[in-house]
């Protein structure tokens, strides 16, 4: 994600990186007005594909060949140290403030460090959009995995094409691979649609399905070389160059503001569109006659762009350990500002203290300079380095092991509380047909208390259940619950659409009484989901239990994930249900 300074430096590319990372940050902050901000990652892919391919081709042109060892060493030197720095600092922080995340963090770290995080998430069937509690703190490094695999294979393909077919065939090869990725994306996404699956991890995280942007950028890099373009062009050509950039930029903003994670076109169109719009912007801003490039070259944009890699690394971790109303209390806007400032501060520290010293060769120079010092000095320096590394490894190992042990004990207690029947409360009269109760893991957690107070005729709940699955379950169960009051929760596990909420209420519209519990999940979609639930509940005469309001200001109701309930929360939840019966 960093521009090598060996080729002509174009400030607007850093400005474009700033656009990408800001879009991703705003999306992960949970702002509903930028539902497609996650497509900033696809813009990063286009930029990386372009810059890396230009770097490779310039190297080949200068030396007549490609030193793969030097290339891979340079990539590791640029990307690895900031990642290691982030991981070590995060381990120290979460050992104190979020120990329940340590086990997953430690198990994910090797995959993050060695460029395989995306396939690890596919293997674990992690859905990028459906983590209702605290998501894995290294989940965002999936994109580093895709890029790392691109860095590994693309230079080899490039050399093969050059030797066998010549430079003229490279754009075709890049476009061919991009087309293969697009076909894989379509095939896998259609499979997901056909199966109505809740997990779409392969579509989002797979290198085969999500590398379109990288190879579109690579194809552009071969066919659109900045140093071969004329600085002086006629007005018509200049207008055309700028027009391409403006169209690409407006189109890109359109994907950010109009595409959302529930959009059925997400996997079929959004990724390729973001890549094509990114290419259009690059086509304009790398041209020396561009008047659009200065718009992306402001000092602020370049400052953010230069730190975009570190900002990307830090933003996800910081945002997930500082969730408003879960980890921190205070004014939402003040917390937004604070969290962004913390990310920028950490990114700046990373750039100055880690990235630049390594990138400039200062660290390497210090080690090479050892041989010119006296033997006593050499021994002291080597001993200091070895001792520091051992202390760092042993210290973080001890800290992480201690945090895992502490977290395991706490989670065992909470699991026992959630799974064991709670002391029965005073029974409540229910209708003759009993209760038909359905939903997700929150319903599973309250089933014993509700059963102790009421007559449950049917209960059907599952961890992670989304609206699409709930509709199918309701359709199957309603024949056996004709006379039952239906109680269900909605909106915890995914961003709802109007069609989904309408379909849910259509399935239960003939029940004697409809009770729906809204969501208090600490995700950006909560308020929008609750608004949809309230809207359709009013149309169908359903009773809404406003769990978001009831639980506000009561952190003692929740397990550490801020979603599932401990006994106090179970009682409050069931109290709200029985009050409506």
Sequence positions of predicted segments:
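Hydrophobic membrane-embedded alpha-helices
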Residues: 2-13, 19-403
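Short amphipathic alpha-helical segments and helix-helix/interface helices
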Residues: 13, 241, 301, 447, ...
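Structural recognition of the beta-strand scaffold that forms the well-ordered cores
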Residues: 45, 114, 436-438, 457-461, ...
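Structured helix-beta-strand junction loops
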Residues: 116, 288, 307, 453, ...
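Residues at alpha-helix caps and immediate loop-helix transition turns in enzyme cores, especially N-
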Residues: 156, 265, 296, 497-501, ...
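Extracellular/periplasmic envelope-modification machinery, especially enzymes
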Residues: 219, 259, 326-334, 344, ...
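Periplasmic/luminal catalytic loop of GT-C fold multi-pass membrane glycosyltransferases
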Residues: 484-487, 496, 500-511
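Active-site segments of SGNH/GDSL-like serine hydrolases
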Residues: 504-531
């Amino acid at each position: 994600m960093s521009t090598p300074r060996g080729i002509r430096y174009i400030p607007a590319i850093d400005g474009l990186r700033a656009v990408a990372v800001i879009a991703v940050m705003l999306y992960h902050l949970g702002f509903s007005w930028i539902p497609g901000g996650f497509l900033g990652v696809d813009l990063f892919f286009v930029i990386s594909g372009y810059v890396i391919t230009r770097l490779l081709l310039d190297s080949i042109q200068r030396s007549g060949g490609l030193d793969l060892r030097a290339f891979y060493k340079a990539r590791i030197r640029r990307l690895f140290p900031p990642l290691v720095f982030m991981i070590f600092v995060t381990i120290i922080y979460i050992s104190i403030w979020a120990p329940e995340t340590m086990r997953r963090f430690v198990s994910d770290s090797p995959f993050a460090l060695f460029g395989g995080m995306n396939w690890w998430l596919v293997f674990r069937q992690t859905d990028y959009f459906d983590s209702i509690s605290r998501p894995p703190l290294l989940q965002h490094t999936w994109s580093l995995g895709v890029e790392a695999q691109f860095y590994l294979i693309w230079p080899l393909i490039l050399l093969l094409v050059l030797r066998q077919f010549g430079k003229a065939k490279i754009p075709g090869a890049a476009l061919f691979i991009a087309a293969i990725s697009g076909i894989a994306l379509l095939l896998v996404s259609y499979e997901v649609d056909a199966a109505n699956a809740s997990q779409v991890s392969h579509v989002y995280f797979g290198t085969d399905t999500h590398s379109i942007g990288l190879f579109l950028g690579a194809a552009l890099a071969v066919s659109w070389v900045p140093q071969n373009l004329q600085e002086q062009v006629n007005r018509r050509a200049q207008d055309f160059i700028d027009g391409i950039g403006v169209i690409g930029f407006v189109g890109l903003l359109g994907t950010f503001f109009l595409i959302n994670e529930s959009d059925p076109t997400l996997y079929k169109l959004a990724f390729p569109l973001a890549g094509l719009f990114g290419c259009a912007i690059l086509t304009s801003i790398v041209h020396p006659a561009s008047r659009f490039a200065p718009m992306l070259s402001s000092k602020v944009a370049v400052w953010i762009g230069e730190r975009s890699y570190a900002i990307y690394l830090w933003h996800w971790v910081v945002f997930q350990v500082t969730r408003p109303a879960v980890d921190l209390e205070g004014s939402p806007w003040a917390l937004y500002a604070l969290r962004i400032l913390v990310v920028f501060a950490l990114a700046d520290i990373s750039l100055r203290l880690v990235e630049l010293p390594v990138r400039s060769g200062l660290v390497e120079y210090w080690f090479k300079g050892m041989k010119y010092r006296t033997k006593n000095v050499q021994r002291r320096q080597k001993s200091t380095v070895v001792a520091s590394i051992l202390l760092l490894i042993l210290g973080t190992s001890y800290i992480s092991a201690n945090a895992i042990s502490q977290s395991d004990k706490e989670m065992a207690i909470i699991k026992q509380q959630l799974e064991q029947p709670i002391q029965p409360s005073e029974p409540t009269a229910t209708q003759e047909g009993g209760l038909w109760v359905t939903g997700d893991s929150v319903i599973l957690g309250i089933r014993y208390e509700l059963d102790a107070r009421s007559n449950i005729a049917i209960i059907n709940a599952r961890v992670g259940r989304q609206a699409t699955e709930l509709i199918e379950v309701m359709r199957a169960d309603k024949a056996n619950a004709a006379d039952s009051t239906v109680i269900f929760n909605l909106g915890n596990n995914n961003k709802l659409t109007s069609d989904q909420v309408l379909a849910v209420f259509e399935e239960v519209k003939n029940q004697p009484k409809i009770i729906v519990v809204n969501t208090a999940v600490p995700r950006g979609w909560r308020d929008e989901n609750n608004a949809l639930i309230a809207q359709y509940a009013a149309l169908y005469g359903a009773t809404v239990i406003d769990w978001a309001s009831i639980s506000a200001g009561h952190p003692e109701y929740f397990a550490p994930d801020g979603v599932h309930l401990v006994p106090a929360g179970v009682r409050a939840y069931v109290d709200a249900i029985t009050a409506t019966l």
